[in-house]
């Protein structure tokens, strides 16, 4: 019998892509899965379910995934929040996390529970918001010391909905990617596949356009960390060793102050055109003088800082 999961895993390994797997703690169809606040109209007869049976089922599935599909980069859990109106409910996560790390010690564990990280988790997830923001009302938790990730969807839905054509613009997607990098976070961008398994044409178009931008500016994103300058209304910074990439996203001026007190700037150039950018040291940092008000989706200035 064909296994689409196995075919996907094999192709990822062939292409050098780390395979991360989404795993829902919620199941709206198994009769042993306890009812939460969602999925109550799916025909399950017993609201209490049979937790021991369901927990064993989940762990058996996870064991299969972590045993038969090669190296797995991460297990990305979702659904803890389904029991948030039942404070006494115990998902028994420590045992599940320990099992994952025992089967594959290098496999990361993340959980989209909208809380501060629990023991045994390796990444902190923020849903539909950048770390430290809470515009969608799902990510009010404090930022931890763990590696960060923000997940967002390209239109309005996580799954496919034919009437949802409100896809984010290429500019919006690039800005979200850049801001995530500037906040030291990975970006997980969701696309709901069509019933036939194909990705929507407009989503592929957006991916191609972001890809074209990344061909030029990828070095300012891949392998960088959030820069030594905190995010500002004008944009963010990313950094690799002594190179600071200033991502100017919203600026209605030709001058930009960079709070680089105590740091010596050796030179500044436009990242794409490599043309010198004038600067001068001033109180508290450095002032950049751009040739014109930026109109690019992301005007990137490369600043060389003396170590």
What residue spans do the PLM features occupy?
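Mature catalytic domains of secreted/periplasmic carbohydrate-active enzymes
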Residues: 1-307
